[in-house]
Amino acid sequence: MQRNIIRSTIILAIPVLLLTMGCSKKFEEYSQNKNLPLTVPPGLVLRSILNSLVVFPGDYEDKADQFIASNYTYYGDNKYWTGSAVLDYSALKNVIAMEAEAKKAAGTDKNPYHALGFFLRAYFFVDMTEKVGDLPMSEALKGTANPTPKYDSQKEIFKQSLLWLDSANTMLADFIANGFVEFSGDWYYQETSKFADATGRNALIEWQKVVNSYRLRVLIELSKRADDAADLNIKQQFADIAGNPAKYPIFSSNDDNLQYVYNSTYNYYPDNPNNYGNNAGRLNLGSTLLTTLGQLNDIRAMVLAEPARGLGLADTDYGSFVGAPLGADLSVLSTLSGAGQISLYNYNHFYATYTAEPTLILSYAEVCFCMAEGINRGWTTGDASAWYENGIKAMFGFYGIKDGDNQVVFRNAGGTGSVTYTVHFAFSDYLSQAVVKYKGNINDGLTQILTQKYLAYARNSGLQAYYQWRRTGIPTFSVGSGTGNGGKIPLRFQYPTNESTSNGDNYKAAVKSQYNGQDDINLAMWLIK
C-alpha cells in the first residue's frame, strides 16, 4: 500500500513539474527586455570609472588647498568643512562589475581590465581612507551578503593597496611582454593620438607608469610612519622603484601626465566665458599660492593672475601679484579686492577660452618632487637637486612658459580689452636665486621641495596640496575667522551619517579605536600621528 502511494505521488508530480518548467521559461522570455543588453562591455564600464579619477577645479578642494578664495558671500565663503566626507564606494562597485564582465569575455582573470582593477581599487581606497581613517575594506562590497562590514585599520588599507599596486605592475608587465594588450575604454591614453595604436600596447605601457608613479605618491604620504611600520617596508619599496626603472617604469616627461583634457565643444574647463560675469570679480587667487609665486619672482604668477593695480606697481612687477589670505574675514577680502589690492584670476588664461589647461590627476612634476623628497629623506640614493629642478621645469612646460621671452596678457585697467607684455624669464636665473637654489639634503632643502610641489599642485590633483600640508606643515596655511572651525584647519572629515545608522556597531568601534569615541574633524588619524 505504501509503495502505491509513493508511485502515485511521483506520477502526479511529473506533469506539475513540467507545467512549472514551462511557465518559468515563458516568464523569463516575456520578462526580458530585449532592448537592453544582458552584458556590458568592460570597456564601457572602464570609461565611467576613469571619469571618477578627476577632481575638477573650482570646488571646495581648491579652497581647502588654499589656491582660491571667494570675496563675495553670495558665491560662498572660505570656511573649511565641518561635516562628513563623500566616500565613493560606487566607483569600486563598478570596478568589480568591470572585472566580472572582462572575465566573461576573456574566460580568465588574466586580462588588462583586471590589472587596471588592482590599480583602481588601490586608488579609491586610499582616496577614502585619507579623508576619514579606518574603513570597511576586506568585508565591503558584498551587498546583502554582508550589510554590516567590519572596519579595516588605515594601516591595513595602505598595506593592501600597496600589494594591489605591485600586482598591477606585475600583470601589466606580463601583458606588455607577451602581447596580450587588447582593451578599450581608456580615454586618457589609448584614445589620444600620442598613444593610440591598434593593439593598446602603448596605452598599457603608460598605465604601468601610472601604477608605479602613483605608488611613489602613496609611499611618500606614509612618511610619518616610515620608521614604525616595519611590515609596510616603506623605505625599501620606495628604493626598489627608484632603483629599477626597467621593472618599475615611472613618468619621465609631461607626455606621461595622467590628466583630464578639456575641449570647447562639450567638456569645458570650469572657469570659462560662460561664467565670467558671475565669477570674475568675486574670486581671487589665494595668498598661499600667489604671494609665494610673487616672492619667488615666478612667472607663473603672471599666467594665473591679474596684477593688483591698486598697489600702484607696474603690471609686470612681481610685487603686483598678491593673493587673498583665506584666514581673513570675507568683508576684509571684499574690501581688498574692490580696492585692487589682491589679485583676481587672469582673464586671458581662465576666461578667454573654454579649455584653460588640463586638470592633472598625477603628473611628472609630482613624481620628480616625490623622488627628490625620498632622496632628501635618505630612502634611496640619487641627485635630489636634479629631480627638484626637473619638477620645476616640468611645471613651466605645463603652462607653456619658455626659457627666454614670454608673452603675458592682462585685462586692461578699464575692464575691456587686453594688454600684452613681453617678459624675459631665464630658467637659470630663477633656479639660482638663493630662495630657490636647492640647499641640500637637509630640512631647508626638504622645505624647498615641498614648496615647489605645492605650487605644482595649483588647481589640480584634488586634495593633495592639503594632504601635504597636513603631513608636513608646508607651506604655512592662512588661518583665522575666514577659515572657520575656531581658526583651526580640520585634519579629517567625519564619517558619512549613513555609517552610524546602517553599520552602527562597527562604526562606533572604529571611532572608539581611533578617536576616543569622538568623530571629530580636528583629531589626527594614524597616517599623520
Where in the sequence are the language-model features?
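Membrane-proximal, proline-rich intrinsically disordered regions
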Residues: C23-Y75, K79-T82, V86-Y89, A97, ...
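Short, hydrophobic/amphipathic alpha-helical patches that form generic packing surfaces
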Residues: L44-V55, L120, E373, L450-A458
